Amino acid sequence: MNLPNRGEGNRNGRVGKNFGRALNYHRKALVQQHVADELAERLVDFPLPERPRVLEIGCGTGFLSRHLMRQWPGGSFLFTDISAPMLVRCQSHLSDLPGQRQFMVMDGEHCAVRGPFDLVVSSMAMQWFGDLPGALQGLSSLLKTNGMLAFATLGDETFREWRGVCAQYGSPFGRPDYPDVAQLQEMWPSGGEGDVEEDHIPVAHSSGHGFLRALREVGAHQPSGQHRPVSAALMRRMLQATRGGQHGFTVTYHVLYGFYTRSFDDRPIH
């Protein structure tokens, strides 16, 4: 397993450390597992070669990775993640499956690998990218002609319930700005065609405190780069406002599924 140290001085590096510390990620990340299952189901009918070359960005502990290796057992897989501890767990969780695989610590927003690949795929990682259009451009350049870039990321309606609480108390939302369907549709690189599908996943918590605790348990609590923490007193009032409901505090994950096919090779000839 290749373990270069990349991106530790920036926000992506802090995100990687958060996920690396999330010891219970594989057991607690139920939404991430559900989204990986859904993305894998959407890939079933995609016509890949019998022995495809596949790159996964942000493999985590291997939710999607297992689907990929089962779907294309003759493939060659490169599994990457910004967190070395996550990669170690992914390697362990795939140990019972036959097939060719490599593991590499890498910031998926700034790929340090060479293509071409038949499939570049990512589930619930791209929401951490600072420049999503630029990342899509870079990842699409790794595709073979007729290769696919497929991913699941978060959309603009994610945690809209918590956003409402923040607005009610004059507190900044503190989460990155996620794209809506139309905005993501405008990000597709030239040289191919893409489509976007969406889903809304409600997740019930006992309270706002339970919601924030769940984010910490899976390492997904890193705020946006410009966020300033609110006072403890204000946070207590905000959390109190989420208590007392008959069904606790439900938040929505707005998931965008993107599928881009490279229709021709516009890379320069060397």
From Swiss-Prot:
Pfam families: Methyltransf_12
Reaction equation(s) it catalyzes: malonyl-[ACP] + S-adenosyl-L-methionine = malonyl-[ACP] methyl ester + S-adenosyl-L-homocysteine
EC number(s) on file: 2.1.1.197
Region forming the signal peptide: none
UniProt key word Transferase: yes
Keyword field: Biotin biosynthesis, Methyltransferase, S-adenosyl-L-methionine, Transferase
One GO biological process term: biotin biosynthetic process
Gene3D superfamilies: Vaccinia Virus protein VP39
Single GO MF descriptor: malonyl-CoA methyltransferase activity
Alphabetized HAMAP family for the sequence: BioC
Family: Belongs to the methyltransferase superfamily.
Official protein name in the record: Malonyl-[acyl-carrier protein] O-methyltransferase
Organismal lineage: Bacteria, Pseudomonadati, Pseudomonadota, Alphaproteobacteria, Magnetococcales
